[in-house]
């Protein structure tokens, strides 16, 4: 492998991994689990637990159901980690919890003094936790990545430290200098044996989708769309199937189901949105397996590329402007599209869905995921049939890289204010 192939692969794999539950509350749970190794007293004796998070962690942790608990809340996520989590499980930190452990965590949440707040001047991903006892205080900080614990302190003494500032800056510099054409070249030249994780993600996310159709809840979007399809209210085709199964996977995940999904860019919903549309079009048209694998890898890479400019979390829905873009690009490439058609598919997505607000992780994310997945399919086939936006109209610039920068500017300079208003609404 060349340096560039390896660098891109390492960056993608860092944010593409199995996760159980929404990754924002899971990040809080993971930090609690990491702090376990440094807490010598029974957590039930804690006098106060302070959980300080970024605006986006707060927003995404407020209303999404934590797997196997039937309830929501970053306070519960923190206690789950502190009371029984194992840091070695990473984003699967909840997989080994049984009913007794969950019941105890719920009791501790009610009994302990847990203070939750958010800090407006932090990175997108930021969790700081202080566990205070009569004669000790344990503090942990996680930031810039869902499992990136930067330090653990006991009584202000640093016992663990892992700062990634330099490597993080190098990664951002590498990604920001890429183009869609260059990313495609690297995707196509990477040895196929290095992409085993792609098939693992397909299996995982399709399983979540199929299980989502079996959930016992008549109000779920995937099941509702499936019933409408069966009644011939909506069409029975690849576009509709994509919307149904993407929604079903989101239903499973957002309602606290016990299915792992493969993330993309650190997000499970975005992993669903990259993988399922590309895989279903591959099935529908009986395409080559290798082309599907590389298309999904391309989708992950485009998702991560956009996030270099928009941020890992923002006030704009990442499934619309990043993961959906990746799906559209991947489908177009897989169908034999030219570089111009791939850019056109991405421009279609931006012209259509830029500005879709992120109002936090919750059950209704299924609606947005379903829309973004369907529009990714539509955008790809429109581009393949010669229908793309004119240049320099609205957010769409003269080339796709500048369009991505335009949307990134909107995320950083305008939608941070949208986030503030949204937090006022949902608090």
Where are these regions (language model features)?
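N-terminal alpha-helical transmembrane segments of multi-pass membrane transport
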Residues: 1-22, 26, 40-49, 53-63
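Alpha-helical support elements that line or immediately flank enzyme active sites
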Residues: 25-41, 271-287, 328-336
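A structural signal for small-residue-enriched, beta-sheet-centric alpha/beta enzyme cores
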Residues: 20-23, 55-57, 144-147, 152-154, ...
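A structural-propensity feature for long, helix-poor, extended segments
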Residues: 45-89, 102-113, 291-341, 345, ...
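Membrane-embedded translocation segments of transport machinery
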Residues: 232-236, 240, 253-281, 285-287
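Flexible, glycine/charged-enriched surface loops at secondary-structure junctions
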Residues: 42-48, 89-94, 115-117, 192-199, ...
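Signature of multi-pass transmembrane helix bundles
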Residues: 109-256, 421-427
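Conserved phosphate/anionic-ligand binding catalytic regions in large, soluble enzymes, centered on
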Residues: 18-34, 259-276, 318-322
């Amino acid at each position: 492998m060349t340096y560039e192939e390896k660098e891109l692969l390492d960056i993608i794999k860092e944010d593409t991994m199995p996760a159980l539950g929404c990754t924002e509350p899971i990040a809080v749970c993971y930090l609690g689990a990491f702090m376990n190794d440094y807490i010598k007293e029974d957590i039930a004796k804690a006098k106060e637990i302070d959980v300080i998070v970024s605006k986006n962690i707060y927003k995404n942790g407020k209303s999404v159901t934590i797997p196997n608990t039937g309830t929501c809340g970053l306070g519960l996520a923190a206690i789950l980690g502190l009371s029984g989590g194992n840091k070695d499980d990473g984003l699967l930190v909840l997989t080994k919890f049984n009913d007794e452990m969950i019941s105890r965590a719920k009791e501790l949440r009610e009994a302990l003094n847990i203070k939750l707040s958010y800090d407006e001047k932090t990175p997108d991903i930021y969790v700081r936790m202080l566990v205070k006892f009569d004669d000790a205080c344990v503090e942990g900080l996680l930031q810039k990545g869902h499992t990136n614990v930067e330090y653990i302190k006991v009584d202000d003494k640093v016992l663990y430290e892992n700062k990634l500032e330099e490597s993080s800056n190098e990664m951002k510099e590498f990604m920001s200098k890429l183009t869609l054409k260059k990313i495609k070249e690297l995707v196509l030249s990477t040895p196929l044996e290095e992409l085993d994780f792609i098939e693992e993600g397909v299996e995982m996310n399709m399983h979540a989708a199929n299980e989502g159709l079996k959930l016992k809840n008549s109000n779920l979007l995937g099941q509702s769309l499936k019933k409408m399809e069966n009644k011939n209210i909506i069409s029975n085709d690849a576009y509709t199937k994509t919307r149904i199964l993407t929604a079903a996977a989101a239903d499973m995940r957002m309602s606290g189901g016990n299915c792992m999904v493969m993330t993309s860019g650190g997000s499970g919903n975005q992993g669903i949105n990259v993988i399922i549309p590309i895989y279903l079009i591959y099935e529908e048209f009986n395409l080559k397996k290798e082309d599907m694998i590389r298309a999904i890898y391309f989708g992950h890479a485009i998702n991560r590329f956009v996030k270099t400019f928009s941020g890992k979390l923002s006030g704009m829905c990442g499934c619309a402007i990043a993961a959906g873009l990746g799906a559209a690009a991947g489908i177009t490439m897989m169908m034999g599209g030219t570089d111009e058609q791939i850019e056109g598919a991405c421009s279609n997505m931006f012209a259509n869905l830029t500005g879709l607000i992120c109002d936090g992780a919750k059950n209704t994310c299924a609606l947005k995921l379903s829309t973004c997945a369907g529009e990714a399919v539509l955008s790809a086939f429109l581009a393949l049939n010669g229908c793309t936006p004119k240049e320099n109209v609205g957010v769409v610039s003269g080339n796709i890289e500048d369009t991505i920068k335009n949307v990134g500017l909107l995320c950083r300079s305008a939608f941070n204010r949208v986030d503030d208003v949204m937090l006022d609404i949902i608090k």
